[in-house]
Every structure is written in C-alpha cells, then in structure tokens.
C-alpha cells in the first residue's frame, strides 16, 4: 500500500485544518497517511504571548532526531505557511536535518507536494 506523510507546521491551526482535509482526501483513495508536525522551536512564553493555541495531540511531532522516518514514505506533502515571504524556521529546521537522507539518495523518487 502507498504510504504518504503529511508534514505540517501550523502556529495558529490554519495549516492543520488544511492538512486534515487533505489527509481525508488521500485516504479516500486507499492511501495510508501519517500526519506529522514539525517540532516547535519557540519558547512556551513566546507562544503564550502570541496567543498560539496548543498543538494537536493527535498529530505526531517530527524532530531533527527522528527525521530519518521520512525515508519510509512513498511521498511527502508539506503544509507550510508563509512568514514574511519565507517558510517558518520550524519547517526549515526539519528540511535542513534531511541532509543525510539527501546525501545518501534516500529521498530520490519520492513524490512531494506543498500546500
């Protein structure tokens, strides 16, 4: 069975809502989906000052330490918001951590998409 990862970073939950809809659509055609979120890098005090809601407990956290899990997926969907025209640091941290996977060709042939 085809196995897709949806990897998101969602500070206020908007990207998470999109991710959940996309997950339902992918699953509706018989594809297995694992919903992941980037590890938060902002201190809890900053998140509180920004009035950020708690992270969803049903979405597993992907960290630089376990980023090699991406090797096991047939494809990856990236859910990212824009921060002043760039991707959030939390997503960039995960992407930077995939250097070893890239160097060893472990991401070659994987389908990818961004929303």
Enumerate the language-model features and the residues they cover.
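Short, glycine-/small-residue-rich phosphate/pyrophosphate-handling segment
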Residues: 108-115
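N-terminal beta1-alpha1-beta2 submodule of the flavodoxin-like/Rossmannoid cofactor-binding fold
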Residues: 1-107
């Amino acid at each position: 069975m085809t196995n897709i990862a949806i990897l998101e970073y969602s500070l206020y939950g908007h990207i998470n809502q999109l991710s959940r809809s996309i997950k339902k659509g992918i699953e509706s055609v018989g594809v297995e989906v694992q919903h992941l979120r980037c590890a938060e890098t902002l201190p809890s005090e900053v998140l509180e000052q920004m009035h950020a809601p708690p992270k969803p407990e049903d979405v597993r956290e992907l960290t630089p330490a376990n980023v090699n899990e991406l090797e096991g997926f047939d494809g990856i969907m990236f859910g990212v918001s824009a921060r002043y025209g760039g991707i959030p640091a939390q997503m960039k941290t995960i992407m930077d951590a995939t250097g070893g996977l890239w160097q060893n060709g472990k991401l070659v042939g994987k389908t990818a998409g961004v929303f």
